[in-house]
Amino acid sequence: MEKIKIIVASDSIGETAELVARAGISQFNPKQCKNELLRYPYIESFEDVDEVIQVAKDTNAIIVYTLIKPEMKQYMSEKVAEFQLKSVDIMGPLMDLLSASVEEKPYNEPGIVHRLDDAYFKKIDAIEFAVKYDDGKDPKGLPKADIVLLGISRTSKTPLSQYLAHKSYKVMNVPIVPEVTPPDGLYDIDPKKCIALKISEEKLNRIRKERLKQLGLGDTARYATDQEELNYFEEIVSEIGCPVIDVSQKAIEETANDIIHYIEQNKSK
């Protein structure tokens, strides 16, 4: 079967049109809906539209477009009708409905949704912070962090840090293991921004046994230090005086929501 060609055309980067096209394609058997996406971003002139139209004529392609400027959208609509081409205007009908509902004209500015604002930069800054201060790499991050996660291994400190970073929180995580003395700065920061991640000995042992099996060491191998690590963890957490969340039976998203709830509650105190 010949591939279905889909032209994704936009006066911005074309991300919206491509997502819609791929969402539509995903609803069909890939063996029966073989496809090829042809991208035409940053359409700025009638000549650019003419190029898209010509390719669609030559390849019998479907045009999926998001054109915001009225003159470009109108020109595309006219050309599609003139040559009886298959097309979908993603933004046009919705913008017309919104305009009628609010009784206002749209901005008609391509790419406005991608405009970089303070919130975007804050999130990027938080993500970079989480990478830089992952696994207690540099204690200088402790006073700068919004949240400091403490825990032994296998408590999902790193994925939690990244998840929270995408919510724009600067997160540092510090491993608590008997062989390594916690950084001095840990005792100097506000314990309200520290969260200790606890895991049951049974769950920890099960995770580690599975890990050993993956390494080819056999399912009878076991860690002898589980209880020692947990005891040391309890000792450090008690000294710091921070709250503890048991992550033994929790998904990362659930733990993250608990952390956010606690942090936001204490901000107002």
UniProtKB/Swiss-Prot annotation:
A Pfam family per the record: Kinase-PPPase
Q: What does this gene product do?
A: Bifunctional serine/threonine kinase and phosphorylase involved in the regulation of the pyruvate, phosphate dikinase (PPDK) by catalyzing its phosphorylation/dephosphorylation.
Q: What is this protein called?
A: Putative pyruvate, phosphate dikinase regulatory protein
Q: Which segments cross the bilayer?
A: none
Give its E.C. classification number.
2.7.11.32, 2.7.4.27
MF term (GO), any: ADP binding
Give me the residues that bind ADP, please. G151, I152, S153, R154, T155, S156, K157, T158
Q: Which reaction does it catalyse?
A: N(tele)-phospho-L-histidyl/L-threonyl-[pyruvate, phosphate dikinase] + ADP = N(tele)-phospho-L-histidyl/O-phospho-L-threonyl-[pyruvate, phosphate dikinase] + AMP + H(+); N(tele)-phospho-L-histidyl/O-phospho-L-threonyl-[pyruvate, phosphate dikinase] + phosphate + H(+) = N(tele)-phospho-L-histidyl/L-threonyl-[pyruvate, phosphate dikinase] + diphosphate
